[in-house]
Amino acid sequence: MILVRSNPQFSNNIINFNFKNYEKIHFVDLENIVGRKPFRSKNYFEKMFYEFDKYCQNHVDFEKDFVFVAANYFIINQLRLRYESQPDNLCLIPINGKDGADKLLVKSINIFIENDMFFQHNYVYIASGDGMFTPPLNALGEIGIQTKVVALFNKINRSIYSATQKITYRNFNELQDYKLDNITVFLMDYISKSLDYDFALKQVVSQKLITVEKLNLDSKLKTHYIVEIRKTKNNKLSSKNVINRLNKIPALVKKLYKLNINVTIKSKSTKDIYL
């Protein structure tokens, strides 16, 4: 385990890292994947450890990957105690302040890009849906580095969808409990964001605010999804801006999940929308 402090020597301290022997390079905003504001309590620490362990189980191979974690000082102190025996491919970065972790991770990625430190075999994972990662995601794509965003449902900035090459949802419990695949969750997520829904995935699924049905058609045809929206605010489905956003769905699914799809969106408030 390595501890790198956010001081004037920060850039010099990280510029000597070498990613040649690593496959995935993870940039984890721990507070973002927890989904709650940091708080000094036993419950918060248990939640934080659970979410980070779950992230690592699903996405990290510590024999092949390098992991950067940025968070509030008191959170990093807890991680130091738990992972002190971890080899030097886990880098902890303590930083206080609003959006401090995101800003420092973005700074780190930019430093690595500017100094040509990524290799073509590296795969960059960003565990945050914050929009400030959009410029580095675009920059990574321009130099041929694969990227994936791992984030919470309805917590992904709209600009991220077009910037990253893949999106995976970090709602591990709901994905398992409701047997949801990433494309189904993406459709619910993207439509929720387009309609300004402020709901968690569990609410959307349990209350059937948005339902998604996958039709098993002939394998030579595009996969067809039927999306039903229970209700919308202020007839948003009739808005040109919303329609323009929804029209991007097939292209985004092809980019993010390598699947050609057609979508029919149904709602009592408007005519069917065919994408």
Where are these regions (language model features)?
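Nuclease catalytic cores that cleave nucleic-acid phosphodiester bonds
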Residues: F74-Q203, Q207-K208, N216, K236, ...
